[in-house]
Amino acid sequence: MSKGTLFDKVWDLHTVRILPSGQTQLFIGLHLIHEVTSPQAFAMLRERNLKVLFPDRTVATVDHIVPTENQARPFIDDLAEEMMRAIETNAKDNNIRFYNIGSGNQGIVHVIAPEQGLTQPGMTIACGDSHTSTHGAFGAIAFGIGTSQVRDVLATQTLALSKLKVRKIEVNGKLSPGVYAKDVILHIIRKLGVKGGVGYAYEYAGTTFESMSMEERMTVCNMSIEGGARCGYINPDGVTFEYLKGRDFSPQGEDWDKAVDWWKSIRSDEDAQYDDVVVFEAADIEPTVTWGITPGQGIGVSEAVPTPESLAESDRYIAKEAYEYMKLIPGSPIKGTKIDVCFIGSCTNGRISDLREAAKFAQGRQVATGVKAFVVPGSERVKQQAEAEGLDKIFVEAGFEWREAGCSMCLAMNPDKLQGDQISASSSNRNFKGRQGSSTGRTLLMSPAMVVAAAVNGKVADVREFI
């Protein structure tokens, strides 16, 4: 069993008791909620005549079903409008901080919490959303939970959980130009598999992660769940503290100094023991593109779609399914694959640094004829900052649509969807069948810079050729 890791320290500090089942009753420091997984949970509270125990530890926003074009109320989609009204009512009735559309603070839940300083090292964080692992970038232990667990946290501020093992994933060295955090995590998932992290928390370490910005670290931790890990985290350091300093909910004055001292104390010990250690080299990572129907089916942009013979026996069944669904020929280069739609955004890559990098490659270029391309900021704050920097104009002049904040085409719960068998170049996190709104639509995951390269060329391209 692991010992002396940040995970162990934070887990122990938040343990209420060991339950008869052997699980740990864990106190949750911050509960983030949104409009999709919370209505049923609140309904269950009402059935039992229960109130939210710690409204001050609960923060709500709307993101999944929010239209990114016409946001006039009532929404055209009746179910979306019903969800909106439910969270508005539930937040008001329970005195929960709620960031609605137009508040200046609304956005994807995993974007707004970090940018406001709500997410801090040493916290336990829960949200009814798979990509809650994002917050681990700050040295927090963050779990995605189901609706019944959302109910439990609302009512008790605790969760019954089994303690995870800890795998240390080291990546060392400097990334080459055109290679980003998105490529790093896609490479890790490719190598360890989509089920490789089941039962584990991932601790990301090594010089590559140490040199990343907080927003890059969030991209990595965001996709931990795609590798099977319940959570992923990075030990807090000077980069973390610099990012948090002065944000809305960050400690101030003397409290700041005390907080930093404590945050340093929860870092994994030098002699910490891990259940497993895996090491990668940054030099081995190139711009990565998924070719199949799981985030683990990724290859370097210079590679070809793998042939069945090149795969492990255990990977061949899902590969066969992927060949048929994606309509890609084994052995054919991924570079040059025709693209219909290009999407930049999501909780993986919808932050200001993502948009800045994408705009750098969009400037002075044009989206290819026949390609629909759009950019969706991860939050209203990101949108405001991007517009202050003129990024919106760069995108629009290049032929991209500039949208309002929301989850958008990451998932099929709002008007932004693929049509028919369109194929998208997407900076999001999942390429499952039908994920982007069409039962025959196809998704290729890649970095925002690679999405721009695809948009300009009308096909999968190597962004390094733009440098």
From Swiss-Prot:
It holds the Pfam family Aconitase. Binds 1 [4Fe-4S] cluster per subunit. [4Fe-4S] cluster binds at C347, C407, C410. Its EC number is 4.2.1.33. InterPro entries: 3-IsopropMal_deHydase_lsu (IPR004430), Acnase/IPM_dHydase_lsu_aba_1/3 (IPR015931), Acoase/IPM_deHydtase_lsu_aba (IPR001030), Aconitase_4Fe-4S_BS (IPR018136), Aconitase_4Fe-4S_dom (IPR036008), IPM_dehydratase_rel_enz (IPR050067), IPMI_cat (IPR033941). Keywords: 4Fe-4S, Amino-acid biosynthesis, Branched-chain amino acid biosynthesis, Iron, Iron-sulfur, Leucine biosynthesis, Lyase, Metal-binding. GO terms for biological process: L-leucine biosynthetic process. Its cofactor is [4Fe-4S] cluster. GO terms for molecular function: 3-isopropylmalate dehydratase activity; 4 iron, 4 sulfur cluster binding; metal ion binding. PROSITE patterns: ACONITASE_1 (PS00450), ACONITASE_2 (PS01244). Pathway: Amino-acid biosynthesis; L-leucine biosynthesis; L-leucine from 3-methyl-2-oxobutanoate: step 2/4. It comes from the Bacteria. It is an enzyme of class 4 (lyase). It catalyses: (2R,3S)-3-isopropylmalate = (2S)-2-isopropylmalate. Heterodimer of LeuC and LeuD. Catalyzes the isomerization between 2-isopropylmalate and 3-isopropylmalate, via the formation of 2-isopropylmaleate. Belongs to the aconitase/IPM isomerase family. LeuC type 1 subfamily. This is 3-isopropylmalate dehydratase large subunit.
